[in-house]
Curated annotation (Swiss-Prot):
Family label: Belongs to the dCTP deaminase family.
Stated name of the protein: dCTP deaminase, dUMP-forming
GO biological process, one term: dUTP biosynthetic process
CDD domains (alphabetical): trimeric_dUTPase
Pfam families found in the cross-reference section: DCD
Site feature location: Important for bifunctional activity: 116-117
UniProt-listed Enzyme Commission number(s): 3.5.4.30
Upper classification of the organism: Bacteria, Bacillati, Actinomycetota, Actinomycetes, Propionibacteriales
EC category name: hydrolase
Region Disordered, annotated ranges: 163-191
Primary role: Bifunctional enzyme that catalyzes both the deamination of dCTP to dUTP and the hydrolysis of dUTP to dUMP without releasing the toxic dUTP intermediate.
Matching PANTHER family: DCTP DEAMINASE
Catalytic-site annotation from UniProt: 129
Length: 191
């Protein structure tokens, strides 16, 4: 079940769902807006001839931070990693989805490529996969509204929430935009 603004407030007030820093003005009818942090990971396209999800390519991206109040410029066709300013923490019976803001989508900004799901039990900054599909550069200001979290109550608490030993939870506690760690549990079925 998708949580309403009332339900979201109840969960925040009870300390079960946490967003730090929390701003009550970000609450929407069935979501809560989140803001863009000031750190970005840009791809070093000259490091490898291709991206290999089975290999450790930790140096595929480098961290960039705009100076002062300057925006980060996302060029047409460019893809970078960003993250939410807020740290989100979920209990074992609530999951979340990261969605973009309609106003930004109308400018050609995509907030996530495929990783819009946040598992119950997760705690950390949420990494955003930012892409510019417009024909002009887009200015991304640290602290601007960048997306929204929608929360869903599970039919029962997760037996093994994110962060438990069973799944490895490679991104638990992540700070800032975190590069892919797909190689740590790469699986390929012989076909």
């Amino acid at each position: 079940m998708l949580l309403s603004d009332r339900d979201i407030l109840v969960e925040i007030d009870a300390g079960r769902v946490a967003l730090e820093p929390y701003d009550p003005g970000m609450l929407q009818p069935s979501s809560i807006d989140v803001r863009l942090d000031r750190f970005f990971r840009v791809f070093e396209n000259h490091k490898y001839p291709h991206i290999d999800p089975a290999a450790d390519q930790s140096d595929l991206t480098r961290m960039v931070e705009p100076e002062g109040d300057e925006p980060f410029i996302l060029h047409p066709g460019e893809f970078v990693l960003g993250s939410t300013y807020e740290v989100v923490t979920l209990p074992d019976d609530i999951a979340a989805r990261v969605e973009g803001k309609s106003s930004l989508g109308r400018l050609g900004l995509l907030t996530h490529a495929t990783a819009g799901f946040v598992d119950p039990g997760f705690s950390g900054h949420v990494t955003l996969e930012l892409a510019n599909v417009a024909t002009l550069p887009i200015k991304l200001y640290p602290g601007m509204k960048i997306g929204q979290f929608c929360f869903f109550r599970l039919s029962s608490p997760s037996e093994h929430p994110y962060g438990s030993a069973k799944y490895g939870s490679r991104y638990q506690g992540q700070r800032g935009p975190t590069p892919s760690r797909s190689y740590q549990n790469f699986h390929r079925t012989p076909i």
